[in-house]
Amino acid sequence: MILYELIKVLRYARVNREVKNKVYLDEATGLPNKNKCEEILTLEAEQNMSICVFDLNNLRIIDNQQGHERGDFYINSFAKNLRKGVDENQFVGRCGGDEFIAFFKNVTKEDVKRNLENIKKECTKCSEIPLSYPAGFAYSNDFFKINNARIVLSGR
């Protein structure tokens, strides 16, 4: 009887993990998805943090001219290079489509700039397809910009 209950608990734990992954992970990139980005933004907005928003250029053109498979490759290439370019202990996620976000906790402006340079370096290493993106960032004491980031995430 105890073994049966233990098996049930383990099975429920696995199912909960799978559901959580589906709710919070972007299947295409393996990065946290818009739901997780919104949750982090809501929970962390009061703390000392910076927010960087990235918007891939030319995704629609790539999709239309080279096909969605190539567009998916473009998105995945950027996602991998974004993750490589940002310090391991910082958060990066995909908000949807061609939009990505990074949250930096307890960092200086110089740290953010260094991470942005690292992302740029990683993206230039991708020789198979040129990665192009504008990036903007705000600091936690700039509530107007953070509110704008929330609006972007909510799709308004």
Regions found by a protein language model. Name each.
Residues 1-17, 115, 121, 125, ...:
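Regulatory sensory/coupling modules that transmit signals to nucleotide-handling catalytic cores
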Residues 21-24, 30-50, 57-87, 93-97, ...:
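Conserved long alpha-helical elements within nucleotide-processing catalytic cores of c-di-GMP signaling
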Residues 31, 56, 107, 138-140:
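Hydrophobic pocket-lining residues within nucleotide cofactor-binding pockets
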Residues 50, 103, 128-156:
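A short glycine-enriched loop-to-beta-strand structural element that forms part of the catalytic core
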Residues 78, 118-119, 132-137:
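Extended, non-catalytic scaffold segments that flank or surround catalytic motifs
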Residues 84-89, 118-130:
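Short catalytic/binding micro-motifs of nucleotide second-messenger systems
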Residues 109-114, 145:
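Short, conserved charged micro-motifs
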